[in-house]
Amino acid sequence: MDNPFSKFTNSRTIQADLSLLEENYIPDSFPHREKQINDMVTILSSIMRNSRPSNIIVYGKTGTGKTSTTKYVTRMLQEATSNVEVIYVNCEIYDSPYSILVYVANFAGGEKIPELGWPVDRIYREAVDRINGTGKFFVIVLDEMDRLIKKSGGDSLYVLLKLMTDVENVKVSMIGITNDTTLLENLDSRIKSRLNQESIVFPPYNATEIRDIIASRLEKVFGPGVVDDTAINLCAAIGAQEHGDARKAIDLMRIAIEIAIRENRLKVTEKEVYEARDKYEMNVMHEAINTLPIHSKIVLLSAIVTQEIEPNSVITGEIYENYRRICEDLGFTPLTPRRISDLLTELSDYGLIVVDERNMGKYGRTRGFSVVKEIETIKKYLMEDENLSMFKTSKMTKQARFDS
């Protein structure tokens, strides 16, 4: 029997190092980000003169190169001097004063501090002492800083800014990365007065710029002629339509190449890109639904039920009534109507439902909702949650066509 893997090592298949297209890959060049790199280097160069640099706030939408550029510049800084430590903090994971202080203190060295159990003031003193003991500059990078502030207000940021002034033997500065240009507007004066920041803006890429970025990556993946120019242009156009998202364009190209390899095709064309787009959108939807809190899933389920039972009455009140019934069937305590309205807005932000204003005559205006894409797929993904699987035995199932 022939080895079933041999077809993937055949010399006539596409050979490519797709790790160069992964999200965590940091390239050694950043087309169309020369100004942002120069601005960041100029600010951080104070470290080379033994001075503390200004704090930096990096603004830009998803896929505009904020994080990868920051990682590149800080890596270059560490190559230029051994007297600096860079702490990269993912604020999706570390989103409270306690968790950030523990992470920073443990990074600075010494016996590992437990993630729970210590008073915050003790951890704070430990972090200050440990950083002081290194004798080095510290640059703390807060990626997705908006999550930190929305979760804990300005408390976490205030603690870090206070830490910067309380260390005596070393100098600490911060780089905050966010896609929210209004993030700092509502912070109180005690934080704003300490922040002393300079801003660097990463504007959305246009299609031509994204094309250049993809082409520069592909040069390192394999030689010319493997990917049609039309395929590169299509990926770039799709990324440009998504508010200049180069990350999505690169992901599409990676998936298109994977499809070509699996199908034993010798070239990547528009056909593979269209297939990649469909697969990408399904993956994004699956991930979005899979990570929703349980009540958000029930609200989405309720919107589908309402739409399939009474398509002309998909309004907040009707959705809430079905939500309440489903909660009772599944053994969950319903949230308030106001909270459900907020969850509907969040589902709209995810692109899982569409919101429109409806005129109810003498009753005023209300919000209407619709689930307009891949309803059967959304049902399937929702039913993967064991907490919702009992819905298939609910009396509402047949009306909502979940019994197939």
Swiss-Prot record:
HAMAP family: ORC1_type_DNA_replic_protein. Involved in regulation of DNA replication. GO terms for biological process: DNA replication. ATP binds at residues 64-68, 205, 217. Belongs to the CDC6/cdc18 family. Keywords: ATP-binding, DNA replication, Nucleotide-binding. GO terms for molecular function: ATP binding; ATP hydrolysis activity. It comes from the Archaea. Pfam families: AAA_22 (PF13401), Cdc6_C (PF09079), Cdc6_lid (PF22703). It comes from Thermoplasma volcanium (strain ATCC 51530 / DSM 4299 / JCM 9571 / NBRC 15438 / GSS1). InterPro entries: AAA+_ATPase, AAA_22, Cdc6_C, Cdc6_lid, ORC1/CDC6, Orc1/Cdc6_arc, P-loop_NTPase, WH-like_DNA-bd_sf. The gene is cdc6. This is ORC1-type DNA replication protein.
